[in-house]
């Protein structure tokens, strides 16, 4: 009986020890104690109960303490519960301290929660980053297209990381400045001879306003001559003018054809009237003879005139026919 009780007691002790080491990270507490970081066992147990991974808070706290940064465990735990990256924030604080960059924990935590990489921002403040823009096509006043590529050296502005625009805004503004500068040049050769004029003009516009960066320099890495857009536009305009002129000429031709048909119709109408009038002549002669307005001699004289006229008309037609036949031969 005593043996069974002893076994039960030993088993209970083993279960208790297992649960204790499962709940309480003793190894982490020993590491913190060795690093002169005062953390109680109950604090670690409380983290477990609050579903906080103790190592995600204690290890950054050890690094901060060793680096001489005074930050409380409550702030680190609160930042972890807010969804922040505690380790990255502490690394950023250490890097800022080594580089003599003023950066408080609250500021670093706010930057991290805003979705920015605060450690990368601190590193970029020490070691500026070079942003390479895509090829920007611009057209000078003489119609020649120039294709330029720029390299922008920027340094992170920690004070404007929250709410400041990112790299894409810098790239867009630099591209706009290049297009404006090249477009204002009278001759594309001026730009090719002096490409640093683009850098000076673009840099003087304060393109970093409202962004999370400070532009240190803008350098034109490459510039090439593209298409002759002016000549192409003139060619297209000439082709368009040609088509318009052809359309107008076709319209005038159609109007002329329609007018010709109208005149032919009018000629036929006049001929019909002549025929109609000629049909009335015998009636008029008969009426004149009945009424005694003309005599028989006058009538025969009129017939002779008509016959003479017809004969002359026939002779003229025959002479025209002979002339045309001789021309064909």
Curated annotation (Swiss-Prot):
Keyword flag ATP-binding: no
Native species: Acetivibrio thermocellus (strain ATCC 27405 / DSM 1237 / JCM 9322 / NBRC 103400 / NCIMB 10682 / NRRL B-4536 / VPI 7372)
NCBIfam families tied to this protein: PRK13665.1 (NF010186)
Pfam family, one: FloA
Similarity section: Belongs to the flotillin-like FloA family.
Keyword hit for 4Fe-4S: no
Function per UniProt: Found in functional membrane microdomains (FMM) that may be equivalent to eukaryotic membrane rafts. FMMs are highly dynamic and increase in number as cells age. Flotillins are thought to be important factors in membrane fluidity.
Subcellular location: Cell membrane; Membrane raft
Main location: membrane
Official protein name in the record: Flotillin-like protein FloA
Quaternary structure and partners: Homooligomerizes.
Membrane topology annotation: Multi-pass membrane protein
Listed GO CC annotations: membrane raft; plasma membrane
Highest taxon, organism lineage: Bacteria
Residue stretches spanning the membrane: 4-24, 26-46
Sorted UniProt keywords: Cell membrane, Membrane, Transmembrane, Transmembrane helix
């Amino acid at each position: 009986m005593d043996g069974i009780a002893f076994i039960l007691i030993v088993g209970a002790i083993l279960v208790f020890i297992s649960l204790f080491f499962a709940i309480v990270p003793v190894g982490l507490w020993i590491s913190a104690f060795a690093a002169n970081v005062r953390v109680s066992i109950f604090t670690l147990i409380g983290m477990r109960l609050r579903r906080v991974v103790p190592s995600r808070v204690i290890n950054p706290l050890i690094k901060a303490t060793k680096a001489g940064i005074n930050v409380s465990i409550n702030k680190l735990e609160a930042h972890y519960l807010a969804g922040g990256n505690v380790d990255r924030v502490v690394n950023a604080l250490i890097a800022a301290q080594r580089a003599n960059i003023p950066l408080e924990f609250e500021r670093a935590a706010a930057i991290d929660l805003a979705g920015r990489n605060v450690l990368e921002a601190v590193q970029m403040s020490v070691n500026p980053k070079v942003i390479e823009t895509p090829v920007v096509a611009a057209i000078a006043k003489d119609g020649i297209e120039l294709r330029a590529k720029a390299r922008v050296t920027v340094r992170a502005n920690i004070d404007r990381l929250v709410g400041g625009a990112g790299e894409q805004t810098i790239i867009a503004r630099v591209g706009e400045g290049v297009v404006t500068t090249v477009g204002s040049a009278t001759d594309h050769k001026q730009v090719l001879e002096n490409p640093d004029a683009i850098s000076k003009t673009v840099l003087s516009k304060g393109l970093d306003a409202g962004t999370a960066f400070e532009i240190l320099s803008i350098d034109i890495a490459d510039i090439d001559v593209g298409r002759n857009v002016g000549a192409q536009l003139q060619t297209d305009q000439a082709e368009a003018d040609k088509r318009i002129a052809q359309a107008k000429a076709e319209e005038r031709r159609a109007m002329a054809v329609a007018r010709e048909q109208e005149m032919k119709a009018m000629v036929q109408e006049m001929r019909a009237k002549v025929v109609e009038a000629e049909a009335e002549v015998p009636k008029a002669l008969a009426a004149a003879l009945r009424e005694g307005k003309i005599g028989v001699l006058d009538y025969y004289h009129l017939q002779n005139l008509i016959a003479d006229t017809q004969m002359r008309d026939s002779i003229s037609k025959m002479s025209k026919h002979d002339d045309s036949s001789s021309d064909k031969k």
